Amino acid sequence: MRNRVKQLRKEAGLRQEDLANLLGVTRQTIIAIENDKYDPTLELAMKLSALLKLHVDEIFYLDQDKEKL
């Protein structure tokens, strides 16, 4: 799964630490998500979606090269 978290965070004027605090996670978690090293839980994805006022599928999407449907 890929994501646009880094781009959207910057557009919102947030630092990684700010976003982490707002979501109740560590900065390291945000770094891992932004670098596609960690897929967030559904709960965390929903919190991020609500915070950014976007649908989850506007933030996260399948990497079609890796995920054959």
Walk through the language-model features, giving the residues of each.
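Key DNA-contact positions within bacterial/archaeal DNA-binding proteins
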Residues: 17, 28, 57
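Short, charged recognition helix plus adjacent turn
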Residues: 60-69
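Short, basic-rich loop-to-helix N-cap that marks the start of a DNA-contacting helix
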Residues: 37-47, 66
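Recognition helix of helix-turn-helix/homeodomain-like DNA-binding domains
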Residues: 25-38
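Short basic helix-loop element that most often maps to the first helix and adjoining turn
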Residues: 3-22
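Short, conserved catalytic or interaction motifs in soluble domains
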Residues: 35, 54, 64
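DNA major-groove recognition helix of helix-turn-helix/homeodomain DNA-binding modules
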Residues: 43-58
